[in-house]
């Protein structure tokens, strides 16, 4: 049976007891409003660890001034039931005061240069600073052997991997595959913001990513592939932030070279909802 923990000393006591038993510990950080994509990360964690802690914390420092922090969906009871069903051992529910004892304005912040400044970093300044700050705190609280993050937030995964290397966290970082709806739309807590009319349109992002991948693999010029992706998405009603081809480390590829492994990434708004997705190849 899952145990819900809100006290840091209690959490550390549980983890210390696991350590004394020689058990391997995994962490799955989330912001709640969990869906099948999140639960797949917990199931992946169970393959690599004996015990799994999942955190639910809507982190204020990773939201910009005009983003959806206050209206971000919070579903604690459903989250707990779902986590218990997939075998999570501890649900860690820290308060803002626990995560930021000096307040969010005075807190020490972490910044990963270069990879944090592009793509999402351009459109959401300060976002990855908030992500790294809260993830590092979760690492110090749980002291996991393994931490699992979803590949839908691919840039976040790259940023966290760099942070772990640079700060010498003794933690293995795993990326969980994107879980999709039947029409290809990547599962996301923000999908519920879509109207009934917008929901079918949203699947065009995945179809566009497939077209981008196929065009690149057929030798298409990257700039032309990206421009066609933007045109296609705009024709479907999206306001496009970016549609790009990158190397797996998010470096920019050189036209005419073989990209392997590579990735196509899209961020676009449909109505009031901002969606991100990617496709590795």
From Swiss-Prot:
Metabolic or biological pathway: Cofactor biosynthesis; (R)-pantothenate biosynthesis; (R)-pantothenate from (R)-pantoate and beta-alanine: step 1/1
Q: Which GO terms describe its cellular component?
A: cytosol
Which residues are listed for ATP binding in this entry? 31-38, 150-153, 179, 187-190
**Compartments where found:** Cytoplasm
Q: Which residues bind beta-alanine?
A: 62
Q: Which GO terms describe its molecular function?
A: ATP binding; pantoate-beta-alanine ligase activity
Main localisation: cytoplasm
Name the reaction it catalyses.
(R)-pantoate + beta-alanine + ATP = (R)-pantothenate + AMP + diphosphate + H(+)
Entry keywords, A to Z: ATP-binding, Cytoplasm, Ligase, Nucleotide-binding, Pantothenate biosynthesis
Q: Extract the CDD domains matched here.
A: PanC
An annotated GO BP: pantothenate biosynthetic process
Q: Which residues form the active site?
A: 38
The EC designation for this entry is 6.3.2.1
Please give the subunit comment from the record: Homodimer.
Other known facts:
The reaction proceeds by a bi uni uni bi ping pong mechanism.
Q: NCBIfam families from the entry?
A: panC
Q: Which family does it belong to?
A: Belongs to the pantothenate synthetase family.
Q: What does this protein do?
A: Catalyzes the condensation of pantoate with beta-alanine in an ATP-dependent reaction via a pantoyl-adenylate intermediate.
Protein name according to UniProt: Pantothenate synthetase
Native source organism of the sequence: Xylella fastidiosa (strain 9a5c)
Q: Which gene encodes it?
A: panC
């Amino acid at each position: 049976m899952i145990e819900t923990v809100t006290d840091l000393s209690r959490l550390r006591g549980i983890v210390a007891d696991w350590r004394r038993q020689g058990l391997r510990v995994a962490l799955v950080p989330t912001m709640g409003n969990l869906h099948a994509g999140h639960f797949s990360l917990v199931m992946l964690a169970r393959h690599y660890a004996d015990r799994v802690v999942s955190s639910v914390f809507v982190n204020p420092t990773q939201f910009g001034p005009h983003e959806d922090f206050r209206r971000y969906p919070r579903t604690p009871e459903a989250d707990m039931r779902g986590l218990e069903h997939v075998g999570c051992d501890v649900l860690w529910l820290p308060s803002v005061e626990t995560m930021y004892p000096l307040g969010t304005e005075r807190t020490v912040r972490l910044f990963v240069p270069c990879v944090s400044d592009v793509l999402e970093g351009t459109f959401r300044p300060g976002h990855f600073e908030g992500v790294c700050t809260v993830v590092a705190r979760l690492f110090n609280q749980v002291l996991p052997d393994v931490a699992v993050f979803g590949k839908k937030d691919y840039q976040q995964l790259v940023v966290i991997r760099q942070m772990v290397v640079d700060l010498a966290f003794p933690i293995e970082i795993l990326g969980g595959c994107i879980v999709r709806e039947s029409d290809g739309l990547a599962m996301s807590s923000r999908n519920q913001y879509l109207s009934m009319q917008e929901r079918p349109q949203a699947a065009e992002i995945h179809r566009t990513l497939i077209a981008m991948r196929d065009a690149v693999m057929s030798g298409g010029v990257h700039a032309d592939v990206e421009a066609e992706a933007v045109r296609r998405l705009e024709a479907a009603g999206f306001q496009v932030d970016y549609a790009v081809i990158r190397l797996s480390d998010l470096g920019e590829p050189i036209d005419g070279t073989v990209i392997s492994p590579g990735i196509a990434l899209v961020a676009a708004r449909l109505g009031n909802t901002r969606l991100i997705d990617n496709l590795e190849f």
